[in-house]
Amino acid sequence: MASISVDQIRKAQRANGPATVLAIGTANPPTSFYQADYPDFYFRVTKNQHMTELKDKFKRICEKTTIKKRHLYLTEDRLNQHPNLLEYMAPSLNTRQDMLVVEIPKLGKEAAMKAIKEWGQPKSRITHLIFCSTNGVDMPGADYECAKLLGLSSSVKRVMLYQQGCHAGGSVLRIAKDLAENNKGARILTINSEITIGIFHSPDETYFDGMVGQALFGDGASATIVGADPDKEIGERPVFEMVSAAQEFIPNSDGAVDGHLTEAGLVYHIHKDVPGLISKNIEKSLVEALNPIGISDWNSLFWIVHPGGPAILNAVEAKLHLKKEKMADTRHVLSEYGNMSSVSIFFIMDKLRKRSLEEGKSTTGDGFEWGVLFGFGPGLTVETIVLHSLAN
Protein backbone atom coordinates (compact mmCIF):
# COMPACT_ATOMS: atom_id res chain seq x y z
CA MET A 1 0.00 0.00 0.00
CA ALA A 2 1.29 3.49 -0.92
CA SER A 3 2.40 5.58 2.05
CA ILE A 4 1.27 8.86 0.48
CA SER A 5 -2.07 9.90 -0.98
CA VAL A 6 -2.80 11.67 -4.26
CA ASP A 7 -4.10 14.61 -2.23
CA GLN A 8 -0.78 14.91 -0.42
CA ILE A 9 1.10 14.75 -3.70
CA ARG A 10 -1.08 17.49 -5.20
CA LYS A 11 -0.62 19.77 -2.18
CA ALA A 12 3.15 19.37 -2.43
CA GLN A 13 3.02 20.28 -6.14
CA ARG A 14 1.21 23.59 -5.57
CA ALA A 15 2.73 26.95 -4.68
CA ASN A 16 1.92 28.56 -1.35
CA GLY A 17 1.32 32.13 -2.50
CA PRO A 18 -0.19 33.95 -5.49
CA ALA A 19 1.47 34.34 -8.85
CA THR A 20 3.59 37.47 -9.15
CA VAL A 21 5.09 39.44 -12.01
CA LEU A 22 8.83 39.32 -11.31
CA ALA A 23 10.17 41.25 -14.31
CA ILE A 24 9.02 43.05 -17.46
CA GLY A 25 10.79 43.62 -20.78
CA THR A 26 9.71 45.49 -23.91
CA ALA A 27 11.03 45.94 -27.45
CA ASN A 28 10.12 47.61 -30.75
CA PRO A 29 11.45 47.54 -34.31
CA PRO A 30 13.97 50.37 -34.85
CA THR A 31 11.95 52.18 -37.53
CA SER A 32 9.37 54.65 -36.26
CA PHE A 33 6.87 56.90 -38.03
CA TYR A 34 5.37 60.14 -36.79
CA GLN A 35 1.62 59.96 -37.20
CA ALA A 36 1.48 63.35 -38.89
CA ASP A 37 3.77 62.06 -41.66
CA TYR A 38 2.21 58.62 -42.08
CA PRO A 39 -0.61 59.51 -44.54
CA ASP A 40 1.93 60.90 -47.04
CA PHE A 41 4.12 57.80 -46.64
CA TYR A 42 1.20 55.37 -46.86
CA PHE A 43 -0.35 56.81 -50.02
CA ARG A 44 3.04 57.42 -51.69
CA VAL A 45 4.49 53.96 -51.06
CA THR A 46 1.29 52.26 -52.24
CA LYS A 47 1.25 54.53 -55.32
CA ASN A 48 -2.18 55.94 -54.49
CA GLN A 49 -1.36 59.66 -54.30
CA HIS A 50 -4.06 60.33 -56.89
CA MET A 51 -6.74 59.28 -54.34
CA THR A 52 -6.79 62.73 -52.74
CA GLU A 53 -10.24 62.52 -51.13
CA LEU A 54 -9.46 59.16 -49.56
CA LYS A 55 -6.11 60.48 -48.36
CA ASP A 56 -7.83 63.44 -46.69
CA LYS A 57 -10.21 61.03 -44.98
CA PHE A 58 -7.23 58.95 -43.82
CA LYS A 59 -5.54 62.06 -42.41
CA ARG A 60 -8.63 62.75 -40.31
CA ILE A 61 -8.65 59.15 -39.07
CA CYS A 62 -4.98 59.47 -38.07
CA GLU A 63 -5.66 62.70 -36.18
CA LYS A 64 -8.53 61.13 -34.23
CA THR A 65 -6.34 58.27 -32.96
CA THR A 66 -4.39 60.69 -30.66
CA ILE A 67 -1.27 58.73 -31.67
CA LYS A 68 1.94 60.73 -32.12
CA LYS A 69 4.34 57.96 -33.13
CA ARG A 70 4.45 54.24 -33.97
CA HIS A 71 7.17 51.67 -34.57
CA LEU A 72 6.74 49.49 -37.67
CA TYR A 73 8.79 46.66 -39.16
CA LEU A 74 7.61 47.44 -42.70
CA THR A 75 9.85 50.07 -44.29
CA GLU A 76 9.66 51.54 -47.77
CA ASP A 77 12.54 49.32 -48.92
CA ARG A 78 10.85 46.17 -47.63
CA LEU A 79 7.56 47.09 -49.27
CA ASN A 80 9.24 47.83 -52.59
CA GLN A 81 10.92 44.42 -52.48
CA HIS A 82 7.47 42.81 -52.26
CA PRO A 83 5.14 44.58 -54.73
CA ASN A 84 2.30 42.12 -54.05
CA LEU A 85 1.93 43.78 -50.62
CA LEU A 86 1.27 47.10 -52.34
CA GLU A 87 -1.55 45.85 -54.57
CA TYR A 88 -4.95 45.89 -52.86
CA MET A 89 -6.00 42.35 -51.86
CA ALA A 90 -3.39 40.70 -54.09
CA PRO A 91 -2.40 37.13 -53.11
CA SER A 92 0.44 37.71 -50.65
CA LEU A 93 0.05 35.31 -47.73
CA ASN A 94 3.28 33.44 -48.50
CA THR A 95 5.20 36.72 -48.70
CA ARG A 96 3.85 37.82 -45.33
CA GLN A 97 4.47 34.44 -43.73
CA ASP A 98 8.09 34.29 -44.90
CA MET A 99 8.79 37.50 -42.98
CA LEU A 100 6.59 36.87 -39.95
CA VAL A 101 7.86 33.40 -39.03
CA VAL A 102 11.38 34.85 -38.77
CA GLU A 103 10.74 38.30 -37.32
CA ILE A 104 8.13 37.50 -34.65
CA PRO A 105 10.44 35.22 -32.62
CA LYS A 106 13.38 37.64 -33.10
CA LEU A 107 11.47 40.62 -31.73
CA GLY A 108 10.12 38.46 -28.92
CA LYS A 109 13.68 37.46 -28.01
CA GLU A 110 14.65 41.14 -27.60
CA ALA A 111 11.92 41.71 -25.02
CA ALA A 112 12.64 38.40 -23.30
CA MET A 113 16.34 39.17 -22.84
CA LYS A 114 15.44 42.41 -21.06
CA ALA A 115 12.98 40.65 -18.73
CA ILE A 116 15.50 37.89 -17.96
CA LYS A 117 18.20 40.48 -17.23
CA GLU A 118 15.91 42.33 -14.80
CA TRP A 119 14.92 39.05 -13.14
CA GLY A 120 18.60 38.32 -12.57
CA GLN A 121 18.36 34.53 -12.53
CA PRO A 122 19.84 31.93 -14.91
CA LYS A 123 17.72 30.96 -17.93
CA SER A 124 17.91 27.36 -16.75
CA ARG A 125 15.37 28.26 -14.05
CA ILE A 126 12.68 28.99 -16.67
CA THR A 127 10.29 26.04 -16.55
CA HIS A 128 7.52 27.23 -18.89
CA LEU A 129 7.24 29.44 -21.97
CA ILE A 130 4.00 31.05 -23.17
CA PHE A 131 4.32 32.74 -26.57
CA CYS A 132 1.52 34.78 -28.14
CA SER A 133 1.19 36.41 -31.56
CA THR A 134 -1.73 37.32 -33.77
CA ASN A 135 0.17 36.53 -36.97
CA GLY A 136 2.74 34.12 -38.37
CA VAL A 137 1.06 30.74 -37.77
CA ASP A 138 3.64 28.00 -38.31
CA MET A 139 4.63 24.53 -37.09
CA PRO A 140 6.70 24.29 -35.01
CA GLY A 141 5.62 27.69 -33.80
CA ALA A 142 7.21 30.90 -32.60
CA ASP A 143 7.40 29.37 -29.10
CA TYR A 144 9.80 26.70 -30.38
CA GLU A 145 11.84 29.12 -32.46
CA CYS A 146 12.17 31.64 -29.64
CA ALA A 147 13.12 28.94 -27.13
CA LYS A 148 16.01 28.03 -29.44
CA LEU A 149 17.01 31.67 -29.97
CA LEU A 150 17.12 32.20 -26.20
CA GLY A 151 18.93 28.96 -25.48
CA LEU A 152 16.21 27.67 -23.16
CA SER A 153 16.18 24.08 -21.95
CA SER A 154 14.87 21.54 -24.46
CA SER A 155 12.47 20.40 -21.72
CA VAL A 156 10.88 23.84 -21.19
CA LYS A 157 7.09 23.39 -21.24
CA ARG A 158 5.67 25.49 -24.08
CA VAL A 159 2.25 27.01 -24.79
CA MET A 160 1.63 28.76 -28.14
CA LEU A 161 -1.28 31.17 -28.67
CA TYR A 162 -1.98 32.31 -32.24
CA GLN A 163 -4.65 34.66 -33.62
CA GLN A 164 -6.15 35.73 -30.31
CA GLY A 165 -6.04 39.48 -30.91
CA CYS A 166 -6.03 42.47 -28.61
CA HIS A 167 -7.31 40.79 -25.42
CA ALA A 168 -4.52 38.21 -25.41
CA GLY A 169 -2.17 40.10 -23.10
CA GLY A 170 -4.68 39.31 -20.38
CA SER A 171 -5.02 35.73 -21.64
CA VAL A 172 -1.29 35.15 -21.31
CA LEU A 173 -1.22 36.46 -17.74
CA ARG A 174 -4.26 34.35 -16.82
CA ILE A 175 -2.58 31.18 -18.10
CA ALA A 176 0.73 32.10 -16.46
CA LYS A 177 -1.07 32.62 -13.15
CA ASP A 178 -2.57 29.13 -13.28
CA LEU A 179 0.77 27.56 -14.20
CA ALA A 180 2.69 29.38 -11.45
CA GLU A 181 0.20 28.58 -8.70
CA ASN A 182 -0.20 24.92 -9.64
CA ASN A 183 3.48 24.10 -10.19
CA LYS A 184 5.64 24.79 -7.15
CA GLY A 185 8.83 26.60 -8.09
CA ALA A 186 7.72 27.25 -11.67
CA ARG A 187 9.09 30.31 -13.44
CA ILE A 188 7.13 31.20 -16.55
CA LEU A 189 8.52 33.33 -19.34
CA THR A 190 5.68 35.01 -21.23
CA ILE A 191 6.30 36.62 -24.61
CA ASN A 192 3.90 38.61 -26.77
CA SER A 193 5.20 39.67 -30.17
CA GLU A 194 3.09 41.57 -32.69
CA ILE A 195 4.17 42.67 -36.17
CA THR A 196 1.56 44.16 -38.49
CA ILE A 197 2.86 42.75 -41.79
CA GLY A 198 -0.10 40.39 -41.68
CA ILE A 199 -2.65 43.20 -41.81
CA PHE A 200 -0.95 45.71 -44.12
CA HIS A 201 -3.27 46.57 -47.01
CA SER A 202 -3.29 49.35 -49.59
CA PRO A 203 -6.03 51.97 -49.17
CA ASP A 204 -9.38 51.25 -50.76
CA GLU A 205 -12.77 52.93 -50.37
CA THR A 206 -14.47 49.55 -49.88
CA TYR A 207 -12.34 48.58 -46.86
CA PHE A 208 -12.71 51.38 -44.32
CA ASP A 209 -11.80 49.10 -41.38
CA GLY A 210 -8.47 48.43 -43.05
CA MET A 211 -7.71 52.14 -43.15
CA VAL A 212 -8.58 52.46 -39.47
CA GLY A 213 -6.11 49.67 -38.75
CA GLN A 214 -3.39 51.35 -40.80
CA ALA A 215 -3.84 54.45 -38.64
CA LEU A 216 -4.02 52.61 -35.32
CA PHE A 217 -1.76 49.56 -35.07
CA GLY A 218 1.94 49.46 -34.21
CA ASP A 219 4.60 46.78 -33.76
CA GLY A 220 6.18 45.68 -30.49
CA ALA A 221 7.01 42.83 -28.15
CA SER A 222 6.79 42.30 -24.41
CA ALA A 223 7.97 39.70 -21.95
CA THR A 224 7.44 38.94 -18.28
CA ILE A 225 8.76 36.47 -15.77
CA VAL A 226 5.89 35.11 -13.64
CA GLY A 227 6.26 32.96 -10.55
CA ALA A 228 4.80 32.35 -7.10
CA ASP A 229 6.66 32.42 -3.78
CA PRO A 230 9.49 34.75 -4.92
CA ASP A 231 12.86 34.01 -3.37
CA LYS A 232 14.07 37.36 -2.09
CA GLU A 233 17.30 35.82 -0.79
CA ILE A 234 18.49 35.34 -4.37
CA GLY A 235 17.20 38.74 -5.48
CA GLU A 236 13.72 38.06 -6.87
CA ARG A 237 11.67 41.24 -6.47
CA PRO A 238 7.96 40.96 -7.32
CA VAL A 239 6.32 43.93 -9.05
CA PHE A 240 2.63 42.94 -8.85
CA GLU A 241 0.65 40.04 -7.40
CA MET A 242 -2.13 38.52 -9.53
CA VAL A 243 -5.12 37.93 -7.28
CA SER A 244 -7.76 36.75 -9.76
CA ALA A 245 -8.21 36.31 -13.50
CA ALA A 246 -11.40 35.92 -15.52
CA GLN A 247 -12.45 35.79 -19.16
CA GLU A 248 -15.88 36.29 -20.69
CA PHE A 249 -17.41 37.30 -23.98
CA ILE A 250 -19.96 40.09 -24.19
CA PRO A 251 -23.44 38.77 -25.09
CA ASN A 252 -24.82 39.71 -28.50
CA SER A 253 -21.47 41.05 -29.71
CA ASP A 254 -20.88 38.61 -32.57
CA GLY A 255 -19.01 40.29 -35.40
CA ALA A 256 -18.07 43.37 -33.38
CA VAL A 257 -14.38 42.56 -33.86
CA ASP A 258 -13.26 39.70 -36.08
CA GLY A 259 -10.49 38.70 -38.43
CA HIS A 260 -10.17 36.18 -41.24
CA LEU A 261 -6.94 34.81 -42.69
CA THR A 262 -7.06 35.05 -46.48
CA GLU A 263 -4.72 34.79 -49.47
CA ALA A 264 -4.29 38.55 -49.06
CA GLY A 265 -3.33 38.38 -45.38
CA LEU A 266 -5.45 38.93 -42.30
CA VAL A 267 -8.63 40.86 -43.08
CA TYR A 268 -10.39 42.30 -40.04
CA HIS A 269 -13.54 44.19 -39.15
CA ILE A 270 -14.14 46.58 -36.25
CA HIS A 271 -17.75 47.62 -35.67
CA LYS A 272 -18.51 51.22 -34.73
CA ASP A 273 -20.47 50.00 -31.67
CA VAL A 274 -17.38 48.50 -29.98
CA PRO A 275 -16.84 51.42 -27.53
CA GLY A 276 -20.49 51.26 -26.48
CA LEU A 277 -20.50 47.48 -26.09
CA ILE A 278 -17.41 47.58 -23.87
CA SER A 279 -18.53 50.53 -21.74
CA LYS A 280 -21.99 49.05 -21.15
CA ASN A 281 -20.56 45.75 -19.91
CA ILE A 282 -17.36 46.69 -18.11
CA GLU A 283 -18.97 47.48 -14.76
CA LYS A 284 -20.36 43.95 -14.56
CA SER A 285 -16.83 42.58 -14.89
CA LEU A 286 -15.58 44.99 -12.22
CA VAL A 287 -18.31 44.06 -9.75
CA GLU A 288 -17.74 40.33 -10.21
CA ALA A 289 -13.98 40.71 -9.80
CA LEU A 290 -13.90 43.17 -6.90
CA ASN A 291 -16.97 42.32 -4.81
CA PRO A 292 -15.03 39.56 -3.00
CA ILE A 293 -12.47 42.18 -1.92
CA GLY A 294 -15.10 44.72 -0.92
CA ILE A 295 -14.14 47.41 -3.44
CA SER A 296 -16.78 49.49 -5.22
CA ASP A 297 -14.96 52.81 -5.70
CA TRP A 298 -13.37 52.49 -9.14
CA ASN A 299 -11.22 55.57 -8.54
CA SER A 300 -9.52 53.82 -5.61
CA LEU A 301 -7.83 51.47 -8.11
CA PHE A 302 -4.88 51.77 -10.47
CA TRP A 303 -5.81 50.99 -14.08
CA ILE A 304 -4.13 49.09 -16.93
CA VAL A 305 -6.48 49.05 -19.93
CA HIS A 306 -5.84 47.83 -23.45
CA PRO A 307 -5.66 51.01 -25.60
CA GLY A 308 -7.99 49.88 -28.36
CA GLY A 309 -8.47 53.50 -29.35
CA PRO A 310 -9.47 56.82 -27.79
CA ALA A 311 -13.20 56.20 -28.31
CA ILE A 312 -13.03 53.05 -26.14
CA LEU A 313 -11.03 54.80 -23.42
CA ASN A 314 -13.37 57.80 -23.45
CA ALA A 315 -16.45 55.58 -23.20
CA VAL A 316 -15.06 53.54 -20.28
CA GLU A 317 -13.90 56.69 -18.51
CA ALA A 318 -17.32 58.31 -18.83
CA LYS A 319 -19.31 55.21 -17.86
CA LEU A 320 -17.30 54.61 -14.67
CA HIS A 321 -16.77 58.31 -13.81
CA LEU A 322 -13.02 57.78 -13.71
CA LYS A 323 -10.64 60.61 -12.98
CA LYS A 324 -8.52 61.58 -15.99
CA GLU A 325 -5.29 60.41 -14.37
CA LYS A 326 -6.55 56.81 -14.17
CA MET A 327 -6.03 56.33 -17.91
CA ALA A 328 -2.89 58.50 -18.15
CA ASP A 329 -0.43 55.63 -18.62
CA THR A 330 -2.74 53.89 -21.10
CA ARG A 331 -3.10 57.08 -23.14
CA HIS A 332 0.66 57.67 -23.01
CA VAL A 333 1.37 54.23 -24.50
CA LEU A 334 -1.29 54.72 -27.18
CA SER A 335 0.26 58.09 -28.07
CA GLU A 336 3.86 56.87 -28.24
CA TYR A 337 3.40 53.38 -29.71
CA GLY A 338 -0.12 53.01 -31.11
CA ASN A 339 -2.24 49.93 -30.48
CA MET A 340 0.22 47.00 -30.33
CA SER A 341 -2.56 44.43 -29.88
CA SER A 342 -1.72 41.87 -27.16
CA VAL A 343 1.54 43.65 -26.29
CA SER A 344 0.12 47.01 -25.19
CA ILE A 345 -0.92 46.17 -21.62
CA PHE A 346 2.64 45.17 -20.75
CA PHE A 347 4.01 48.51 -21.95
CA ILE A 348 1.39 50.17 -19.73
CA MET A 349 2.29 47.96 -16.76
CA ASP A 350 5.96 48.82 -17.27
CA LYS A 351 5.20 52.54 -17.53
CA LEU A 352 3.03 52.42 -14.40
CA ARG A 353 5.60 50.75 -12.17
CA LYS A 354 8.48 52.94 -13.41
CA ARG A 355 6.51 56.18 -13.09
CA SER A 356 5.33 55.19 -9.60
CA LEU A 357 8.97 54.78 -8.53
CA GLU A 358 10.14 58.00 -10.22
CA GLU A 359 7.36 60.02 -8.58
CA GLY A 360 8.05 58.56 -5.15
CA LYS A 361 4.71 56.76 -4.88
CA SER A 362 4.43 54.28 -2.03
CA THR A 363 3.48 51.33 -4.25
CA THR A 364 4.14 50.01 -7.75
CA GLY A 365 0.51 50.91 -8.54
CA ASP A 366 0.68 54.71 -8.37
CA GLY A 367 0.40 54.58 -4.58
CA PHE A 368 -2.78 52.47 -4.66
CA GLU A 369 -3.00 48.97 -3.22
CA TRP A 370 -5.41 47.37 -5.70
CA GLY A 371 -5.76 47.61 -9.45
CA VAL A 372 -7.38 46.09 -12.52
CA LEU A 373 -6.06 45.06 -15.90
CA PHE A 374 -8.45 44.80 -18.85
CA GLY A 375 -7.95 43.25 -22.27
CA PHE A 376 -10.55 43.65 -25.03
CA GLY A 377 -10.50 41.69 -28.28
CA PRO A 378 -12.34 39.60 -30.86
CA GLY A 379 -15.54 38.09 -29.61
CA LEU A 380 -15.98 40.63 -28.01
CA THR A 381 -13.79 38.98 -25.40
CA VAL A 382 -12.93 40.65 -22.09
CA GLU A 383 -10.04 39.60 -19.85
CA THR A 384 -10.18 40.94 -16.28
CA ILE A 385 -7.24 40.58 -13.90
CA VAL A 386 -7.16 41.92 -10.35
CA LEU A 387 -3.69 43.05 -9.34
CA HIS A 388 -2.22 43.81 -5.92
CA SER A 389 0.63 46.32 -5.92
CA LEU A 390 3.73 46.06 -3.76
CA ALA A 391 5.77 48.60 -1.84
CA ASN A 392 8.36 50.57 -3.80
Swiss-Prot record:
Keywords associated with the record: Acyltransferase, Cytoplasm, Transferase
Stored Gene3D superfamilies: 3.40.47.10
One cellular-component annotation, GO: cytoplasm
GO biological process: polyketide biosynthetic process
Subcellular location, record wording: Cytoplasm
Molecular function (Gene Ontology), one example: acyltransferase activity, transferring groups other than amino-acyl groups
E.C. no: 2.3.1.-
CDD domains: CHS_like
Tissue-level expression: Expressed at the same level in leaves and in glandular trichomes.
InterPro entries: Chalcone/stilbene_synt_C, Chalcone/stilbene_synt_N, Polyketide_synthase_type-III, Thiolase-like
Catalytic residues identified in the record: C166
Main location: cytoplasm
Function comment: Chalcone synthase that may use malonyl-CoA and hexanoyl-CoA as substrates but without producing olivetol or olivetolic acid.
PANTHER family: CHALCONE SYNTHASE (PTHR11877:SF14), HYDROXYMETHYLGLUTARYL-COA SYNTHASE (PTHR11877)
Family: Belongs to the thiolase-like superfamily. Chalcone/stilbene synthases family.
Protein name in the entry: Chalcone synthase-like protein 1
Provenance organism: Cannabis sativa (Hemp)
Organism classification: Eukaryota, Viridiplantae, Streptophyta, Embryophyta, Tracheophyta
Gene that this polypeptide is encoded by: CAN383
